[in-house]
């Protein structure tokens, strides 16, 4: 493969890598990996394998480990390299760095030193899961991993009960059954949800339904692979509530039906299409 080989300016380059299918990496990501003076990786073996698959030569360049337990000295060394004029590419084990992956402290340190921080965007399990979920994507909140301890997990779920966004979680395959049971217990069994497993991989699986049915389906099931759990936003089941109707009536005094529906849906965190249908009904009453 022909790479665009040209000197990179000194800086920190965050490069997104595939979450499963190796061919999902971007051409720009490969160009940066082929050109950077130094490559830092959460898992050096995974990084080397990815480069080998795509024929990216190292040509004597180093691939150094950098992960959550690397410590301040590792951050200082990489910052020193960049200040010395080097381009440093950073890759996490899979997906986009910093999104439930290492890199935050390194990025903050580079910014604090006035160094350039550049993103080479690409694969993300969060966005891939949202894309196939069938849940609203106009507003979402990425929660990441919930606490492993049951009571702490339930407390955090309770704090998210009224958030009017689609919620996105990562979870261990060993805990997903218990997590879904906790979600059902705290949020109720009627909330729509999706469990995505092994996205972009050979055994990709997307399970859709309400929390009640999904909790039953995964109870006691032996699950393998990477898991993303999505939960529909609060309020979606109550779109006909009197508060929505009154908000629409107030908005429609000064706005067109379509504009009023858009404003009210955004303010209340509800699907615009459903609010628009209610607005049309109110318009017919007049």
Regions found by a protein language model. Name each.
Residues 1-66:
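Glycine-rich, flexible N-terminal cofactor/catalytic loop recognition
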Residues 9, 87, 166, 173-286:
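A contiguous loop/helix-start segment that scaffolds small-molecule binding in enzyme catalytic cores
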Residues 11-15, 85-92, 140, 165-169, ...:
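Generic beta-sheet signal
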Residues 33-39, 114-118, 166-167:
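Short active-site oxyanion
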Residues 41, 92, 117-122, 169, ...:
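General beta-strand structural signal in soluble alpha/beta enzymes
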Residues 65-72, 146-149:
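Conserved helicase motor
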Residues 98-113, 180, 184:
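Short Gly/Thr/Asp-enriched flexible loops that form oxyanion-binding sites at enzyme active sites
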Residues 105-163:
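Class I SAM-dependent methyltransferase SAM-binding "motif I" and its flanking Rossmann-like core
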